[in-house]
């Protein structure tokens, strides 16, 4: 009891010390811990357009491999927190084939994954080129390799999980909604299915996206091939998607880079064009890639902080590399083995009705 009383007295005297010091003009250093103000983090999402397994692309890859395809934008792909591409071919099995009825080798998406692509958009008009059996095999092969995809589903249960696809990226919950205007080959009424550009079917998908995610990214496969500007149907659909909760819209299918506009705070990239193909038309060789930056801060809702489009150019074998390569248009001319192709790229850029960079920083 005596020891307890002594401790109480000691504590009391310590409490009186600051008061005594103040009376004598003595300052006692007292530091109070202050929580640092939360700093915003940025989640970077990188998207490219259509990856096509044209016959000559596959022939070239058989001779030279895939390594040159995205060699010049590897830093963009791997530097992003999430990279997305439109895989516009099914894995329908042998014999492999290019346009007009695609069936690509399994090694192609394996390479795309190795180079850094994290999510594959399968909701496009070529995914049923080998019919429902080809789509079933595509899903099976993607699952077997652990590759994330959206836009299609093998069953009703899978459809709920994959459409939308919810991805956690550095704490950001991102919903990816992918669908197509139609398919070149018909589909059976049973599973597997492709997500269609149908408002009644998309309403529950968008509702799940709003409920489960912080940000809703919509990737529609739409529009008219080779048209450099969007049409009324695309614009009307974009406005409907925004009303349904879309924060960003990045489209594909036209095989050319289309115009872009801001609808309020929502950027709408109507088409990024191709990412890799054997198409010869000059507008189709000009490609787009988008980098999106989402600011995240503890206690605040994540929001779009930056959106930037850069131009790429699809080079054929012998122009820059032995095989195909998507290269930034800013790449110096010294990289070209074929100077005429560099001049062609510059002329195409000058004649394009698209502004090279759309940015919101």
Model-derived features with residue positions:
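Intrinsically disordered, low-complexity segments enriched in glycine/proline and serine/threonine
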Residues: 5, 19-20, 84
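Bacterial N-terminal signal peptides
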Residues: 10-20
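Bacterial N-terminal signal peptides that target proteins for export
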Residues: 1-9
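Acidic, metal/ion-coordinating pockets
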Residues: 24-361
């Amino acid at each position: 009891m005596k020891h307890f009383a002594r401790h109480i007295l000691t504590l009391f005297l310590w409490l009186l010390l600051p008061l005594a010091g103040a009376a004598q003009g003595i300052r006692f250093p007292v530091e109070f811990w202050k929580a640092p103000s939360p700093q915003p983090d940025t989640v970077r999402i990188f998207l490219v357009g259509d990856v096509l397994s044209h016959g000559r692309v596959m022939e070239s890859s058989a001779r030279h491999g895939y390594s040159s395809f995205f060699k010049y934008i590897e830093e963009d792909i791997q530097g992003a927190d999430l990279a997305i591409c439109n895989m516009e071919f099914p894995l329908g099995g042998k014999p492999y084939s290019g346009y007009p009825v695609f069936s690509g080798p399994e090694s192609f998406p394996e390479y795309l994954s190795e180079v850094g692509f994290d999510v594959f958009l399968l909701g496009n008009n070529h995914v049923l080129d080998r019919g429902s059996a080809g789509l079933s095999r595509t899903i099976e092969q993607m699952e077997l390799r652990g590759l994330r995809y959206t836009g299609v589903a093998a069953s009703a249960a899978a459809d709920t999980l994959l459409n939308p696809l919810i991805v956690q990226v550095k704490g950001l919950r991102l919903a990816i909604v992918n669908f197509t205007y139609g398919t070149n080959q018909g589909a059976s009424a049973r599973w597997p299915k492709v997500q269609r550009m149908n408002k009644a079917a998309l309403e529950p998908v968008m509702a799940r996206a709003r409920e489960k995610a912080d940000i809703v990214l919509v990737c529609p496969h739409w529009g008219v091939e080779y048209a450099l500007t969007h049409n009324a149907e695309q614009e009307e659909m974009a406005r409907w998607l925004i009303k349904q909760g879309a924060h960003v819209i990045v489209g594909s299918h036209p095989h050319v880079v289309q115009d872009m506009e801001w609808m309020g705070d929502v950027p709408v990239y109507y088409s990024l064009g191709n990412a890799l193909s054997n198409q010869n038309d000059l507008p189709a060789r000009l490609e787009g890639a988008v980098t999106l930056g989402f600011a995240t801060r503890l206690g605040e809702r994540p929001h779009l902080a930056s959106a930037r489009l850069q131009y790429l150019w699809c080079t054929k074998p012998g122009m820059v590399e032995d095989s195909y390569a998507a290269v930034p248009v800013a790449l110096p001319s010294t990289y070209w083995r074929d100077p005429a192709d560099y001049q062609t790229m510059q002329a195409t850029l000058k004649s394009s009705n698209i502004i090279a960079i759309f940015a919101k920083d």
